[in-house]
Design a protein with these regions (language model features):
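Short, small/polar-rich motifs associated with maturation and membrane association
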Residues: 2-353, 358, 365-367, 371, ...
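Short coil/turn segments at secondary-structure junctions
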Residues: 5, 188, 304, 315, ...
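Catalytic cores of large soluble enzymes that bind and process phosphate-bearing ligands
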Residues: 122, 126, 308, 312, ...
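Surface-exposed loop/interface segments of Gram-negative outer-membrane beta-barrel transport/assembly proteins
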Residues: 168, 179, 233-299, 340-347, ...
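Alpha-helical support elements that line or immediately flank enzyme active sites
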Residues: 183-184, 444-449, 463-465
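Outer-membrane beta-barrel strand-turn architecture
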Residues: 230, 323-326, 358-362, 449-455, ...
Length: 558
């Protein structure tokens, strides 16, 4: 045994820890770059600051560093404990056309900090949100989940400066994030972006510096430009159907104390305070709690009660694309669903997208992008709190020695030391519900005329209608104590009832007139943009509430 231990120790000490930092030629941190030991499966990725740590068995090993849109770089470790790595853009991609503010450019003509991601990179992700699919794919762009609730939007920031301006098919969207829609008076750009069908996206371009200045003050935190897919000229009709069905499981979670460990911890704490632990629990009682076999000495596992295994998440998408000499089209429909690790939390979204472009003459083109969205999330209506957070906290706040049910009878919810965290009440049937429903319709129409001397005139009009509804019903369920002598259950209401509906409608209009001039004279390019924008929106919010006398009215018509 001693020999084996010595050998294992020697092997452990032979490993070398290598740290490093990965950036692009502008000094921008690259998040999510792959760092692997060449010829092995040993690897890691860079963090939000572009840093990485990796253990290697041989200091003469070679690291391979790669990231989308950049050349893979190899570096020998040698005696260096910290590596500074600079990745260069792949020159083969420099002739690609990139969407920028009010136009397009080739990558080699760009002077600002602009990054883009194509459709194939986005669709490798199984995220239900666009920001989630974009995570780790663009240097300087960070994403942060508000919480793990199904369908909850992910906040996106450029250089950690705050929420950017979102421009989708040329239409700008500002507004608040998805947690604040009940207070917001306009259309949330973050919501519109996160609820896009990822399969419909052709590319995402991020403007990080002065390149965003053309959008004015609203772009002070950067700009995210989204271009959706279109049909191609003389392209045959193509029908595509794809999707996935998966199961979600927690990969890591703190191990919770059982009843025996909890009781022993209390006894040891009393002893450390100079008190007599036997006054709290006798040795016989402690042994019974640790055995957990006798009535009244059961251990309760609140992790198993709150968390579920193999929770489904799915997505299905169907699209038709094609084009003739004059008309190109793209049509898609998609449905996404996700359940939470906790029961009775659910999210569903259906997307519809139609893009069509028609050349009326050789110089005159008209087109439209029409989209619709139906989105619904279901939560538990826990009194006095958030059912999702309360369910997570319940695993830590509930004591493993107290039963969720009075006398272990599942017909009676126990009156525990903190009733707001008893998971026995965390269901829509007992505590009620809080549902959010969003319906959105959007149409963008444009007309464009190309003059013969390099001038292009374009007019765009957009109409967006968003209706959001909150529907909540909190039940006054009872909590009970058990009288062992009388064999009776004594109940009291956990909280008062309430019934509420909030309806918010936002019709928004946007118009853009634009003149573009582009001319190439030998090796020189001349370009100019003249534009005019106008936008307005209406906001209507209706709030209804009452205190029902019973839990058994399924709906009150307001």
């Amino acid at each position: 045994m001693c020999v084996v231990q010595l050998l294992l120790s020697a092997a452990a000490f032979a490993q070398t820890q290598v740290t490093g930092h990965v950036a692009d030629v502008r000094g921008e941190d690259i998040i999510g770059a792959n760092v692997t030991v060449k010829g092995t499966s040993n690897g890691t990725i860079t963090d939000i600051d572009g840093n990485f740590t990796i253990n290697v068995d041989d200091k003469n090993a070679t690291l391979a560093i790669s990231f989308i849109g950049y050349k893979t770089k190899e570096m020998k470790i040698g005696e260096k404990a910290h590596l500074q790595i600079v990745l260069e853009e792949d020159m083969e991609t420099l002739d690609e056309v990139v969407v920028v503010g009010y136009g397009t450019q080739t990558k080699k003509s760009l002077t600002g900090a602009i990054s883009d991601v194509k459709s194939d990179a986005l669709t490798r992700s199984v995220s239900t949100t666009t920001a989630g699919a974009l995570s780790g794919k663009i240097a300087g762009v960070s994403t942060r989940a508000v919480d793990a609730r199904p369908g909850r939007g992910i906040n996106l920031e450029i250089r950690n400066m705050g929420s950017p301006l979102f421009v989708i098919d040329g239409i700008p969207y500002g507004g608040m994030n998805s947690r604040d829609w009940l207070q917001a008076s306009d259309v949330s750009g973050s919501d519109v972006f996160n609820a896009l069908n990822i399969e419909d996206i052709e590319s995402i371009t991020v403007l990080k510096d002065a390149s965003a200045a053309i959008y004015g003050l609203r772009a002070s935190n950067g700009v995210v430009l989204v271009t959706t897919k279109k049909g191609k000229k003389n392209d045959k009709v193509s029908i595509n159907v794809n999707g996935y069905y998966g199961w979600q499981n927690l990969t890591r979670f703190p191990e919770l104390a059982n009843a025996g460990q909890y009781v022993r911890g209390l006894a040891e704490a009393a002893q450390n305070r100079g008190e007599d632990p036997s006054k709290l629990y006798s040795p016989e009682e402690l042994a019974k709690w640790e055995a957990g076999t006798e009535p009244g000495y059961k251990s309760y596992d609140y992790y198993d009660m709150v968390m579920r295994k193999n929770v489904p998440q799915y997505h299905i998408n169907a699209n038709v694309t094609g084009g003739s000499e004059k008309t190109n089209y793209y049509l898609s429909v998609a449905h996404t669903g996700q359940d939470a690790m906790m029961p009775d939390f659910k999210y569903e979204r259906t997307n519809l997208q139609l893009n069509i472009d028609t050349k009326i003459t050789d110089r005159f083109t008209i087109g439209a992008q029409i989209s619709g969205k139906y989105e619904k999330s279901e939560d538990v209506g826990l009194p006095g709190g958030d059912g999702y957070y309360s369910a997570i906290l319940a695993m830590f706040k509930m004591q493993p020695i107290e039963s969720p049910y009075a006398n272990d009878n599942p017909e009676y919810i126990n009156n525990v030391h903190e009733n707001g965290y008893n998971p026995a009440a965390f269901s829509r049937d007992i505590a009620g519900y809080k549902d959010n429903l969003t319906r959105n319709a959007n149409i963008n129409a444009y007309a464009q005329y190309d003059f013969s001397f390099g001038l292009t005139a374009k007019a765009t009009f957009s109409y967006n209608y968003t209706n959001s509804r909150f529907d909540g019903y909190q039940y006054a369920y009872h909590i009970y104590t058990y009288d062992k002598e009388k064999d009776t259950y004594n109940g009291t209401p956990a909280a008062g009832r309430w019934r509420s509906q909030i309806d918010r409608s936002v019709p928004a209009r946007y118009m853009q007139l634009q003149l573009n001039y582009a001319k190439q004279i030998k090796n020189h390019n001349i370009s100019a943009v003249l534009g005019y924008e106008a936008s307005d929106y209406d906001w209507t919010k209706k709030t209804y509430g009452t205190e029902p006398s019973t839990d058994y009215l399924p709906l009150l018509q307001f």
